[in-house]
Amino acid sequence: MKEYIERVTDGDDLTQAEARAVATTVFEDATEAQIGALLTALRAKGETEAEIAGFAEGMRDAARTIRPDREGLVDTCGTGGDDYNTINVSTTSAIVAAGAGVPIAKHGNYSVSSSSGSADVLEEVGVDIEAEPPDVEETIERDGIGFMLAPVFHPAMKAVIGPRQELGMRTVFNILGPLTNPADADAQVLGVYDPDLVPVMAEALARLDVERALVVHGDGLDEIAIHGETVVAEVTDDRIAEYTITPEDMGLETRDIEAISGGSPEENAADLRGIVTGDVTGAKRDIILANAGAAIYVAGVADTHEAGVEQARQAIESGAAADKLDDLIGA
């Protein structure tokens, strides 16, 4: 560990295999001082795509994993940290996408950058967010949707809680969550808080052999935006295509970002329920359509973003999205 800390401090990059080995040491027997020194040195140097992928592999190695018997699993987990207090976009979008027939293995945690994270809002609507891995696996196989709470599936992360809190700055662990789905999702929509992270995370996903993914940053949001342009890196096998999309490209209209503001877990839970049942419309519904449509598209169920949006709309209007919320609550 000391050798790796010295190398990173000197500005040397680690290989993917070395980063994986370092992550294993961090989780198993590194001291808090060593962990803090390593994370600080990596932050100062700047983490490479290979290092990020290697750390993700090490985190996956230490995780409690599941393998649901479902083809084409999709995750909609973002990094958080965009400093906008919006409604719970990725969580609600996952439920709507499931209503459109996309099998969802949703990975998430409590709030990072808003007053209500995926775990906060799902707990508020009545989901058993602390379900054990075998139970979540069964739920995904039966209902086509399940939620995996990060602390339940990644207990080894306890080793880095102290150093991260004491450092008080972003580290590589702030971006690893979306790369470490415990169900080994085949495809995902991954939102990032910084547009500079779009190509970096896309390359990391390619190194991790994801089948298909969209890495997105929407004009300040770690989501696909309806208030402006979204930068996208689409990963397909080893190919990465970068492009931008606007609300109009998806058959939607541009909205004010203030119109998608969130609130407390109780308020966001009410919005989630209202959107999936069709009672909440306007901008809040539109941003869910945009992001659920992306999940439907990346799953291969729709051929374009716009077609995905239309299928998301149909999932809400038919009651299928509300049925998936009921399945998740009743699991």
From Swiss-Prot:
Instruction: One GO cellular component term, please give it.
Output: cytosol
Q: What domain of life?
A: Archaea
**Pathway listed:** Amino-acid biosynthesis; L-tryptophan biosynthesis; L-tryptophan from chorismate: step 2/5
Q: What top-level class of enzyme does the UniProt entry assign?
A: transferase
Cofactor note (record)? Binds 2 magnesium ions per monomer.
User: Subunit structure, per the record?
Assistant: Homodimer.
Show the NCBIfam families listed in the entry. trpD (TIGR01245)
> What protein does this entry describe?
Anthranilate phosphoribosyltransferase
Higher taxonomy: Archaea, Methanobacteriati, Methanobacteriota, Stenosarchaea group, Halobacteria
- Gene that produces this protein: trpD
